[in-house]
């Protein structure tokens, strides 16, 4: 489905593909099964099942799909007009956020769908599209605004955290922030394990002290405080769901 404003929903199923692509509007490329490889500004992004990559209209990518089975994907394009409208509605001073979202300042990155508002929306859209539920124009117009709300909500948090990193070189700033996000995702995925700092920073090219310092500056909490808070949140959800204290204890 697509409209005259450059909003679109597309599904794909390919075993092999190689080519260049210019992102249309604000685009999320979600991998339903398999994996896709993106090369953007000299950096490689491997997008696995349950993950998506996010870019704006200035993003140029080389894409490669090469699998034994079909790689199934969902692509959602949102026009800059809608992103502007939603950002202006939710933020009284949206200029800096919009500049981050819609210019070459934007942080292209991959995200695990289970951890974001947009990821939840993409899962739901894939379910509905697979069931043939997206044929009504009004429904799709409302859907694009809803997706834009998810993007703006997620990226407003990213922008706030990213802005706390004070480095003059944009490449350095972006690289360090991606490493911090990757480390945080590792923590989220291993909350029930005995996590060690060496494991968390295994792919980060920095010392333990430098990592702790940057993590706390960016996310306000130290790595230990972050893990503790997430474990307490998880325990609370389990208790509310009927689990007993013994089952819930880490």
What are these regions (language model features)?
Residues 5-6, 14, 29, 105, ...:
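A short alpha-helix capping/helix-coil boundary motif
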Residues 85, 103-168, 175-178, 182-185:
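An amphipathic alpha-helical interaction segment
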Residues 2-3, 236, 246:
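Long, hydrophobic/aromatic N-terminal blocks
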Residues 153-156, 165-177, 182-233, 240-243, ...:
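Basic/polar phosphate-binding segments, predominantly the helix-turn-helix DNA-binding elements
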Residues 17, 39, 65, 72, ...:
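Generic anion/oxyanion-binding catalytic loop in active/binding sites
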Residues 7-12, 69, 87-96, 116-120, ...:
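Short, highly charged low-complexity linear segments
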């Amino acid at each position: 489905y697509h409209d005259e404003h450059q909003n679109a929903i597309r599904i794909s199923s390919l075993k092999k593909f190689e080519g260049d692509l210019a992102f249309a509007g604000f685009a999320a490329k979600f991998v339903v099964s398999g994996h896709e490889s993106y090369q953007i500004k000299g950096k490689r992004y491997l997008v696995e099942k349950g993950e998506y990559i996010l870019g704006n209209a200035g993003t140029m990518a080389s894409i490669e799909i090469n699998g034994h089975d079909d790689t199934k994907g969902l692509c959602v394009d949102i026009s800059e007009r809608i992103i502007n409208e939603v950002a202006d509605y939710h933020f009284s001073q949206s200029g800096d956020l919009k500049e981050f979202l819609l210019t070459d300042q934007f942080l292209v990155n991959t995200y695990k769908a289970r951890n974001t508002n947009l990821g939840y929306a993409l899962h739901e859209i894939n379910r509905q599209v697979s069931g043939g539920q997206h044929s009504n124009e009004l429904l799709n117009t409302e859907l694009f605004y809803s997706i834009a709300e998810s993007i703006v909500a997620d990226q407003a948090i990213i922008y706030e955290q990213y802005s706390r990193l004070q480095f003059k070189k944009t490449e350095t700033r972006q690289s360090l922030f991606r490493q911090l996000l990757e480390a945080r995702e590792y923590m989220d995925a291993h909350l029930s394990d005995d996590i060690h700092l060496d494991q968390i920073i295994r792919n980060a090219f920095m010392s333990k002290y430098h990592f702790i310092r940057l993590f706390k500056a960016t996310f306000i909490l130290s790595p230990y405080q972050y893990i503790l808070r997430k474990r307490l949140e998880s325990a609370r959800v389990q208790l509310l769901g009927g689990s007993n204290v013994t089952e819930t204890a880490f």
